[in-house]
């Protein structure tokens, strides 16, 4: 059973913002307003490009989130989502910690297994993404607790660490939460095994409930503690269109 929690609201700087061609200053202004008016979180997409919309402006999420952190005080800040292919897990771990420190403990790592877009045209192999995703999250969490006096090792199929460490401890304890983007049987199972939250997009209530139950079964299977289960966050990204005319809003939604 999902532990009842207060309902929170955030904003997503996703394809909608990129397609609109908003400038950096406009995005920062909107984020400052969201922070002042009581929104709980701000997320930022991670794409290299969206060539189907030629006039879109596509920016780096980690740089933008750091800029947003500097002009906000309360909102949590996360990627929605970065992927497990384009960056080495050490880079993702350090970027997340850096954002957490700049924001004084407000960082969230939203991460998925990736997609062919943004990979193939840059000749980045799109192979075994879910297996790499699992190892990435394990490596990232291992590195969160590393120091020069406590180096870490990892011997995976795709990633290896030998006496590795980072030198910037996160503010959040034990580390920034990991929200996993999942919708398939295996990815839902891994979310229950490794995640601190779940970040699906565009679900119906029925599908959300079904997939949430699969995550809960995985939590039980992998002996997650009751505290981990209670603290697990169930999120959902949905599109919202504002208009004085309901039919116009529905047309935009479609």
Which role does the model predict for each range below?
Residues 1-254:
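Active-site-adjacent structural elements that line small-molecule/cofactor binding pockets in enzymes
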């Amino acid at each position: 059973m999902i532990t009842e929690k207060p309902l929170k609201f955030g904003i997503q700087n996703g394809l909608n913002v990129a397609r609109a061609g908003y400038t950096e200053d406009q995005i920062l202004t909107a984020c400052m307003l969201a922070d002042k008016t009581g929104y709980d979180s701000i997320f930022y997409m991670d794409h290299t490009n969206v060539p189907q919309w030629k006039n879109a402006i596509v920016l780096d999420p980690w740089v933008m989130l750091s800029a947003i952190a500097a002009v906000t005080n309360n909102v949590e800040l996360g990627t929605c989502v970065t992927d497990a292919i384009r960056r080495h897990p050490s880079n993702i771990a350090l970027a997340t910690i850096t954002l957490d420190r700049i924001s004084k403990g407000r960082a969230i790592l939203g991460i998925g297994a990736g997609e062919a877009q943004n990979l193939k045209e840059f000749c980045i192999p799109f192979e075994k993404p879910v297996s790499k995703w699992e190892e990435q999250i394990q490596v990232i969490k291992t590195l969160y607790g590393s120091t020069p006096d406590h180096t870490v090792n990892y011997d995976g199929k795709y990633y290896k660490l030998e006496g590795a460490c980072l030198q910037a401890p996160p503010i959040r304890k034990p580390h920034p939460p990991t929200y996993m983007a999942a919708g398939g049987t295996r990815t839902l199972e891994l979310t229950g095994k490794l995640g601190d939250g779940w970040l699906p997009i565009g679900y119906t209530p029925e599908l959300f409930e079904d997939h949430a139950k699969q995550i809960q079964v995985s939590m039980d299977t992998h002996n997650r503690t009751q505290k981990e289960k209670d603290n697990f966050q169930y999120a959902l990204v949905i599109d919202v269109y504002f208009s004085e005319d309901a039919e116009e809003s529905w047309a935009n939604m479609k």
